[in-house]
Design a protein with these regions (language model features):
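Mature extracytoplasmic or organellar-lumen-exposed domains after removal of signal/transit peptides
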Residues: 16-312
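Sec-dependent N-terminal signal peptides
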Residues: 2-12
Length: 312
């Protein structure tokens, strides 16, 4: 009887609340703001730890990117910040030419891909010393990324003031964003380097990892998993966990949480950024994706988006 009253009270308290609006307010906006602050810190001191901090905060924003669906003008914004697995050209060789160019920093960085975190990684980690030229270029690159991050933040703040979608659409957006993120985690960020993806079956190669130069690929994966936890773990507001439990999906949700922990535990015991030993990590990522895409989404009665080979 007491439990029933508690559940009823909880339902009444959260009766008019919406998951996406709470996520934007409590997760998305703080994550973007943290990334902006870390970018500014990195501008002041281009060191290894500051780069890792910025990278991890950005991965959280990217993993839970709702802005492109809320305002289609910003659908491609993440690709102005990060081109991993979305670029056919050799960015590193192009950035080498940018450094050697006599043009001023803004002119030299004329392509969008030159102003991404991937380009920044090359600036900082291509050798053991950061030259004056590389510092100048890095500041311009970070200014560009900060500008895009400010735009993302504005999209979220605008939507909070005037939501334009219905609650059912919003709920579907949250779960489908988690599904797409888990697919990219499995295929792009683990499978391509570990030799478990369909594209590179039985051909493990650490050089394919997302942040091979800076040895931050595991750190990026860990940050993405932290972002997932921000959604699926219980919070003091009406959240995805409360919604899932209301729909009778508590068991399916616990499987998701367990798989995230399993992956984070495995990251701690693996040699740093060594994907040649990441079979277990890949299998856990596969289980996580299936827990979202098969079990949880079915229990929630939400239609999943069909993912193509690129996870889009």
């Amino acid at each position: 009887k007491v439990l029933f009253l508690l559940v009823l009270f909880s339902s009444l308290v959260f009766a008019n609340e919406r998951i996406l609006l709470n996520v934007i307010k409590n997760v998305s906006i703080p994550n973007v703001q943290n990334t902006i602050e870390n970018a500014r810190i990195l501008q002041q001191d281009l060191n290894t730890q500051n780069f890792t901090n910025f990278l991890q905060s950005w991965k959280k924003v990217e993993a839970l990117y709702f802005a492109g669906d809320l305002n289609e003008d910003f659908l491609d914004t993440p690709r102005y910040i990060d081109v991993f697995n979305n670029l056919k050209e050799d960015l590193n060789s192009q950035m080498k030419m940018v450094i050697e160019s006599k043009d001023d920093a803004k002119t030299a960085l004329f392509k969008n891909s030159f102003k991404t975190i991937n380009a920044l990684e090359y600036m900082i980690f291509n050798d053991n010393e950061i030259s004056k030229r590389e510092k100048e270029l890095s500041i311009v690159i970070l200014n560009s990324m900060i500008s895009h991050l400010e735009e993302i933040k504005t999209v979220y703040e605008t939507y909070l003031l005037k939501p334009t979608k219905d609650e059912k659409w919003e709920n579907a957006l949250v779960i489908n964003t988690l599904i797409a993120s888990s697919y990219r985690l499995k295929e792009w960020r683990i499978g391509n380097a570990s030799g478990n993806s369909s594209k590179f079956k039985n051909d493990a190669k650490n050089e394919r990892a997302e942040y091979f130069l800076s040895q931050n690929s595991f750190a990026a994966i860990d940050a993405i998993l932290d972002a997932h936890n921000q959604i699926v773990k219980k919070n003091p507001y009406y959240d995805f966990a409360a919604f899932a439990m209301d729909k009778g999906a508590a068991i399916q949700l616990l499987v998701v949480i367990d798989k995230i922990k399993e992956m984070q535990d495995e990251l701690k015991v693996l040699p740093k950024d060594d994907f040649t030993k990441a079979n277990k990590l890949f299998n856990s990522a596969k289980d996580l994706h299936n827990a979202y895409y098969v079990s949880l989404i079915e229990q929630l009665s939400i239609t999943g988006k069909i993912l193509d080979a690129d996870g889009d």
